[in-house]
A protein has these predicted regions:
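Catalytic Tyr-X3-Lys loop
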Residues: 100-121, 139, 156, 163
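Active-site helix of classical SDR
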Residues: 124, 159, 167
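Conserved glycine-rich cofactor-binding loop
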Residues: 7, 12-15
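Short C-terminal tail/terminal secondary-structure segment
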Residues: 90-96, 240-287
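Residue(s) in the substrate-gating loop at a strand-loop-helix junction
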Residues: 143
Length: 287
């Protein structure tokens, strides 16, 4: 098992990519503490995975929740090797012309950047001492939208670019005892939601025609399941793999970037035209 003996904490582990990470990490021998906002999802994880998982129900947008997660993890499992920030929200490609004005725009900006950037900073701040003592790793979930345009609207894209900057700065500051990296997925089947300030909190990525769009945009021709991205997290969390990597962002985007802007937009427009429901500006979404 690639993670035997490793102790991991993760924010946002109750569904989608986060749940896939937790499930795989336990299968690889890790013990995992999870911060999850939904009591129902937390209880479901415990039923499925048993004593190798410790759950904290809380809101990752609070720095106190991150601190409580780390304390719970160390109290239960004795130490902490790896911290994973996986909280996020997608803006469903809401373009600048579609964004609200004034107070609502300010609220949307605050919500997206708090979830997509600040929650990761809170977890890094809370966990860095224990992870440093373990010569461990911090891993964030970035997005293909943090590497190139077209994976979201300006709020989401800017937040994911900010997260990439945070990865690199933390890697610089915490070396040589902590490796800080990120995985930047492309689209996937997930129940990732939108910001409430944009009225998108009840809408999930799974409810968009993402599969049809992504199969045309990606050179690989298929929309991955969340579990297909988890190998990268396992490698980055391992004590023996990826030991030379820090400040890196793994672009596991199915080749979105090499497709080219013109070809991607043509495929996206064609798929949306054939669907009765689509993202507001036809973006495909990311991790």
């Amino acid at each position: 098992m690639r993670l035997a003996g490793r102790v991991v904490c993760i924010s946002g582990g109750g569904s989608g990519l986060g749940r896939a990470i937790v499930t795989r990490f336990v299968a690889e021998g890790a013990r995992v503490a999870v911060l999850e906002k939904s009591p129902e999802k937390a209880a479901d994880l415990v039923r499925e995975l048993g004593t190798d998982v410790e759950l904290l129900v809380g809101d990752a947008t609070s720095p106190h929740a991150a601190q409580s997660l780390v304390e719970l993890c160390v109290k239960r499992f004795g130490h902490l090797d790896v911290a994973i920030g996986n909280v996020g929200v997608w803006d469903f490609g809401t373009s600048i012309d579609e964004l609200p004005e004034r107070e609502l725009l300010e609220a949307a900006f605050h919500e997206v950047f708090t979830l997509n950037v600040a929650t990761h900073l809170y977890l890094a701040q809370a966990s860095k001492g224990h992870v440093r003592n373990a010569n461990g790793a911090i891993i964030f979930t970035a997005s293909s939208a943090g590497m190139h345009p077209g994976g979201g609207g300006p709020l989401y894209t800017a937040s994911k670019h900010a997260l990439v900057g945070l990865v690199r700065q933390l890697a610089y500051e915490l070396a040589p005892h902590v490796r800080v990296n990120a995985v930047a997925p492309g689209g996937m089947r997930t129940d990732l939601r939108g910001p409430s300030a944009l009225g998108l909190h009840t809408r999930a990525v799974n409810e968009t025609p993402l599969a049809g769009i992504y199969s045309r945009v990606s050179p690989m021709g298929v929309l991955p399941d969340a579990s297909q991205y988890v190998d990268w997290y396992v490698a980055l969390a391992s004590a023996t793999e990826a030991t030379t990597m820090t400040g890196a962002v793994i672009e596991a985007d199915g080749g979105e970037r090499i497709r080219g802007r013109a070809a991607s937009e043509a495929a996206r427009a064609s798929a949306i035209a054939e669907s009765s429901v689509g993202p507001p500006s036809g973006c495909i979404g990311g991790g």
